[in-house]
């Protein structure tokens, strides 16, 4: 799979998710086999460039792979300037957000709200592509709602505007993340394009990934929520794609070490206060389905210091061998 001049020999990607796919999480997913990882969404509003949140999200040092940065907005010139600005900071690929369904994004006509205005889509894509000399990609959905599934039109506009690749989530905006992702329109759209396509949505196992790739003829898969609390999913996806079977499961000790390293990295990246707060959701995703996991999560959520959070989690993980011999993994059951 080629994105401009970049060759991706492993087109299994980590989707950009605001507040989740930060530098520590991208790094761990890459270590487990993600061949592409897009940074968290950055606003195109220049007045917000120097906020603490934006500065953290703009920290690409030591990324460990191609630096793909997602920008969001609805003003063509502002988006073009944001693209130039981020390339100046080290972005090697610019990704345009046309898939976010969040109200605060759609209320300013950005994210998936853009799909309602095809002429504006063309203006934005052309402005960004012409503003930078790096590849520009686009993440989008099936459409705004079921009666307005204009993905084929948006995809053709994208290709004609010079977009290097598409990532398509198999839901409309009004679906948010409810119901099941649908892939029929993605397959139809892919058949009329000459640029690479990632398929995204509800891909939570290697078996599902193989089936969706077969159905859509997509060039790669993009994993979002399926990786939450399971970054080792990328290891299994890659092995299954190459060999047609699952690799041996990670041991409890290997999973525990991964989790603790991740939490420590968040504490170091964000600092004491923000690190503890942001780590809570990841800890929940990791342990909720494990023995006594929910109870432990509630206990950890009451803690305010990084040391207490880490030590309590470590103590819990040390008890797991007494309660189970493996990490919960639904696609390995039976």
Positions of PLM-derived features:
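Glycine-rich, positively charged N-terminal anion/phosphate-binding segment
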Residues: 1-2, 17-92
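N-terminal small/glycine-rich loop or linker at the start of catalytic domains
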Residues: 1-12, 45-68, 100, 104-108, ...
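Aromatic- and acidic-residue-enriched carbohydrate-binding clefts of CAZyme catalytic domains
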Residues: 115
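Hydrophobic faces of well-ordered beta-strands that scaffold small-molecule active sites
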Residues: 12-16, 37-39, 67-71, 94, ...
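Alpha/beta enzyme core
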Residues: 31, 80-110, 118-195
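Active-site beta-loop-alpha junctions enriched in small/polar residues
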Residues: 17-19, 42-44, 72-74, 99-101, ...
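Alpha/beta catalytic cores of nucleotide-metabolism and tRNA/nucleoside-modifying enzymes
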Residues: 8, 12-13, 18, 23-24, ...
């Amino acid at each position: 799979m080629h994105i401009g001049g970049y060759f991706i020999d492993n087109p299994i990607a980590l989707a950009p998710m605001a507040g989740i796919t930060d530098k520590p999480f991208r790094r761990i997913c890459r270590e487990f086999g993600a061949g592409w990882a897009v940074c968290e969404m950055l606003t195109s509003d220049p007045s917000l460039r120097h906020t603490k949140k934006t500065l953290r999200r703009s920290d690409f040092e030591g990324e460990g792979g191609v630096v793909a940065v997602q920008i969001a907005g609805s003003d063509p010139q502002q988006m073009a300037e944001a693209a130039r600005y981020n390339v100046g900071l080290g972005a090697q690929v610019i990704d345009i957000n046309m898939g976010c369904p969040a109200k605060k994004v759609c209320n300013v006509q950005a994210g998936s709200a853009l799909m309602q205005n095809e002429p504006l889509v063309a203006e934005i894509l052309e402005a960004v592509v012409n503003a930078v000399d790096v590849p520009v990609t686009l993440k989008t959905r099936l459409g705004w709602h079921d009666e307005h599934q204009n993905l084929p039109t948006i995809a053709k506009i994208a290709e004609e505007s010079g977009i290097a690749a598409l990532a398509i989530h198999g839901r409309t905006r009004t679906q948010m993340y409810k119901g099941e992702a649908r892939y029929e329109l993605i397959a139809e759209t892919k058949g009329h394009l000459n640029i690479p396509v990632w398929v995204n949505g509800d891909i939570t196992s290697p078996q599902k990934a193989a089936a969706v790739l077969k159905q859509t003829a997509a060039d790669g898969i993009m994993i979002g929520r399926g990786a939450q609390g399971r970054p080792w999913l990328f290891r299994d996806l890659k092995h299954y794609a190459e060999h047609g079977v699952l690799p041996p499961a990670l041991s409890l000790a290997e999973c525990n070490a991964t989790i603790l390293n991740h939490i420590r990295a968040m504490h170091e990246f964000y600092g004491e206060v923000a690190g503890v707060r942001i780590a809570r959701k990841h800890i929940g995703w990791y342990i909720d389905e494990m023995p006594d996991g929910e109870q432990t999560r509630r206990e950890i959520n009451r803690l305010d210091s990084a040391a207490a959070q880490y030590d309590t989690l470590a103590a819990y993980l040390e008890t797991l061998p007494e309660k189970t011999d493996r990490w919960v993994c639904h696609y390995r059951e039976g």
